[in-house]
């Protein structure tokens, strides 16, 4: 099992890092008490092979030595990486001031600056054990997410799921669509008596539409658009991109085009899904 522990001072970007790992398929737990870490990992070991947890100052044991013992208690067969995320005191003060959030140690009657410095001392034991230290002073949220993927996982892009969906305009446009293409101008198998009761998944309809130059060109242009911009979408912290193809009823043209595109992209992209909305109802 691969275990990633995210820690660092409040406001440094721990939540952003954890979300980036969740998008990559990690089972994530936010702000787990350290003394429950062995129990959690033993509980999920049979269900998940990639687990990420975040630990903040509120969940540390009172005795710093206990932290070392807890981490050492974890099975040596597990691959554990500790990531410590931090920023300068001035930047953390600015972030708290802009968001008007209350620092976790503010209840100790400390000023914001004092709380930030005190937090650093309390987190020192886990910072000393860190395998990777990330300074977020000059990073945006998206840059931090990309850095997490690149430094920890050895890849700049998350596993973006590319979804092709067919639909009928008379039933409404899918609300989750990122791109919508209108195929209603293309030759319609509905008006062919032998094809009317078939769908875009049936061979006779595939032959009919595949022999139409305008259909072939339409598919090629969609394919070219998605191929051009897919790398940029992957680097933009996206988990899903849904490409919706619509015709009048969602039975022939849109089904054929969505199915054709999904087959093409399955050869060049690791995670492609296909949905035929009207056929599944």
From Swiss-Prot:
Chloroplast listed as a keyword: no
**Annotated positions binding ATP:** 8-15
InterPro entries per the record?
P-loop_NTPase, RapZ-like, RapZ-like_N, RapZ_C
Q: Give the source's domain of life in one word.
A: Bacteria
A Gene Ontology molecular function term for this protein is: ATP binding
Indicate yes or no for the key word ATP-binding. Answer: yes
The record's section on Pfam families has:
PapZ_C, RapZ-like_N
Q: Which UniProt keywords apply?
A: ATP-binding, GTP-binding, Nucleotide-binding
Q: Where does GTP bind?
A: 56-59
Family classification: Belongs to the RapZ-like family.
Its annotated function is as follows: Displays ATPase and GTPase activities.
What this protein is called in its record is Nucleotide-binding protein MADE_1004170
Species of provenance: Alteromonas mediterranea (strain DSM 17117 / CIP 110805 / LMG 28347 / Deep ecotype)
